[in-house]
Amino acid sequence: MKNNLRYGIRKHKLGAASVFLGTMIVIGMGQDKEAAASEQKTTTVEENGNSATDNKVSETQTTTTNVNTIDETQSYSATATEQPSNATQVTTEEAPKAVQAPQTAQPANVETVKEEVVKEEANPQVKETTQSQDNSGDQRQVDLTPKKATQNQVAETQVEVAQPRTALESKPRVTRSTDVAEAKEASDAKVETGTDVTSKVTVEDESKIEAPKGNNVQPHEGQRVVLKYKLKFQDGLKTGDYFDFTLSNNVNTHGVATTRKVPDIKNGSLVMAKGQVLDNGRIRYTFTDYIKDKVNVTANLEINLFIDPKTVQSNGQQTITSKLNGKETSGTMQITYKDGVKNQYTNVNGSIETFDKEKNKFTHVAYIKPINGNNSDSVTVTGMLTQGSNENGTQPNVKIYEYVGVENGLPQSVYANTVDSTQLKDVTNQMGDKLKVQNNGSYSLNFDKLDKTYVIHYTGDYLNGTSEVNFRTQLTGYPENRYKTYYYYNNGYTLTWDNGLVLYSNKANGDGKYGPIVDSNNFEFSEDSGNGSISGQYDAKQIIETEENQDNTPLDIDYHTAIDGEGGYVDGYIETIEETDSSAIDIDYHTAVDSEAGHVGGYTESSEESNPIDFEESTHENSKHHADVVEYEEDTNPGGGQVTTESNLVEFDEESTKGIVTGAVSDHTTVEDTKEYTTESNLIELVDELPEEHGQAQGPVEEITENNHHISHSGLGTENGHGNYGVIEEIEENSHVDIKSELGYEGGQNSGNQSFEEDTEEDKPKYEQGGNIIDIDFDSVPQIHGFNKHNEIIEEDTNKDKPNYQFGGHNSVDFEEDTLPKVSGQNEGQQTIEEDTTPPTPPTPEVPSEPGTPTPPTPEVPSEPGKPTPPTPEVPAEPGKPVPPAKEEPKKPSKPVEQGKVVTPVIEINEKVKAVAPTKQKQAKKSELPETGGEESTNKGMLFGGLFSILGLALLRRNKKNHKA
């Protein structure tokens, strides 16, 4: 073979290879450019909703950090379903965007899917991750979060609920871990079923049952007994825990009210425990959420108890008991009922049986009874509402019963068991037209001869919104006389019995007419801060006003009788109406006999189961009980006073002010001014605003603004201090010394007399005052704060003369610092502070050197242009020792990305990493891909490939010429 031919073959091969290789380079560089554009695109979501995109290939470390920033803030995961088309379609409920990802789940594709998930963050919702139940293919769960974020969130629980669904619902849903955790917490926040803590309640020996007016109780005068419990609870009470106690069956807590409920125990407007009336005389109090973290809980419980007319039907002694945790508290009382009004022929008595303010209805029982066999002729009994009548109301229901029991067997308590046929016989139908009932609430009943005992049961309504209700039972008749003589017609008589209900609502003292009735359910406790410490106390005894749902009008019941139309009153009371909606009822009885005037006293006390609370609570969190802790105490005893009229319309309108002086700062105390707003139910609302304090002391007291309170701020934090309490005076921060120089902001606290001196290369005079000179050098101190007390002389000397500054103050604090952000010290003597600097130079940080020796500045190596360099924090060292700046290798920040004309640098921070962007307006996110930064290298590669191809073509062409030759 010829040499030239062999050479041509080699050139042919070389030329063809060059053309092929160059073409592949050109094509490959173009494909590489597209891959770089999609692979490195990550989105950093800022708190303001804007995003910064970084596409620089070389900045992989920063890109990873930014992705982790997103993951640590909001972590997402999705379930991907494999489809037969070998592609996974990932969508979210918020936006119908789809991203095609291969089954192999390459890292670049994971990043792409992750970006879409982050973009959908605008309206995150908790969704159920479900798995298909059809035959569309197997499923697997793909975690789309980077590994670092997954490691940081191992503790988070991914909750997935599997439910059947159709093939149309094959799209996987994205579930946010944090939202699932919140939903789980919400589901766990169920109402805790409490436990019976009755066994954890101790009844103190001071507990008792007593009557306010001695041991003789007259229920018809509105008198009642009071259960006074002094209880102590073990620690660890929880929401829902309850305790029970049982009352004897001869008393109840409601009186004539229809509602069977005891009032709640309140702390102001906060319900500490809810009261409930159970069967068989059991009372239960269930603690609410406010009992949490309360320790040393004690309760002084006072509850009004009313004599039950059904159980106690006659006069005599009664033993009233209450049993709690096996301990019985008891009291023995003499019960005495009123006899009503009577003459030698007939007796009339009556009572309000029930009163329902919600339905505006009441029931009344009246006795009509001949005395000693003395019958009467032509007797007419009428019942009517003289006040509170509803003209457009419905007809009342009136039942007439004949008493068929033993003689004198009617209950003295004026109680009618209408279902007991052995005692009462219903004769309503036998009366026929003798009984007439009107729509205005009145009735009339005629007897030709009254020779039997009758019980009249009345059920009617009264006018809604009326302020007073008075029901009158009146009997007129003539003594039985066989001969109708002149004496007979002039010897008629009239008996009148009024049951008056005075509905009143006031903001004063709800005392009954016998004086104060205080239901002080004092609730005392200490506050547990949760870390085992108990600090401070809030000591307040409150009597709280309870509001009624529809009508907060308590009731006062009066009874009036008159004979022969003559004047005069015999005053008395029979019952008190008690309702849980703060409506108490007082019952008055007034009678008069044969024109004899007089006033026999006896007024009903109106009361309500007010459940005031006495409690102690922490007002200073995590504070030790020093002189700066102020304790508050409130008064539980309401002021007295009442206004009465003959109509027994009792309206109390007063504001009694009481002050209690209790513990305080060493030489001043606080006075808690409590205004008591009460209703008849003795419920007093105390409005207490803790932030307001009042001072009072024996000596002169001045308002305290800042009590030797010093606050120093610096980069390292805040220091607070309290001086000793001496003479309390108003102090303002008037001794603040600031020293400004080229090195930054400097301040100091010094005691005694000080002088500050700064020397340069030139000799300067030195100023010294006092002894115990302490040299303090300030060299490259970024920031020092402080306050100076007493007199200070501050001088700063440079190349030019500087004036001297003098400041007045009180105490002294000095600082000795060197290359430290903040160091504090304190000295008692006089100090001299020297500060050495070098001649004026550009403001660049200096390398610390020995005190007094000027050191030339060390130039700082600038970072690459266009790349921001994060500041290097200085490391604190011991005072007075220079510390060279720590050598820290600067981290490469991300290259700023152009967004319009705004450059958004992304800086990595050691703490929770977030993208840091300059202040700017919100911009719409651009959809096109930004510049990737790899264009220059790509163009060079393409140029190289092109040249390579041209060279190959030239070789091929030359080879052809050789063949021709």
UniProtKB/Swiss-Prot annotation:
Residues 933-965 form a propeptide. A motif (LPXTG sorting signal) lies at residues 929-933. It is found in: Secreted, Cell wall. Residues 39-55, 75-92, 126-139 have a biased composition (Polar residues). The keyword Repeat applies. Residues 1-36 form the signal peptide. Residues 748-839 are annotated as: 4 X approximate tandem repeats. Residues 839-885 have a biased composition (Pro residues). A motif (YSIRK-G/S signaling motif) lies at residues 7-18. Gene3D superfamilies: 2.60.40.1280, 2.60.40.1290. It is a peptidoglycan-anchor. Keywords: Cell adhesion, Cell wall, Peptidoglycan-anchor, Repeat, Secreted, Signal, Virulence. GO terms for cellular component: extracellular region. Residues 840-895 are annotated as: 4 X tandem repeats, Pro-rich (WR). Pfam families: Big_8, Fn_bind, Gram_pos_anchor, SdrG_C_C, YSIRK_signal. GO terms for biological process: cell adhesion. Residues 194-514 are annotated as: Fibrinogen/elastin/tropoelastin-binding. This is Fibronectin-binding protein A. It comes from Staphylococcus aureus (strain MRSA252). The lineage of its organism: Bacteria, Bacillati, Bacillota, Bacilli, Bacillales. The gene is fnbA.
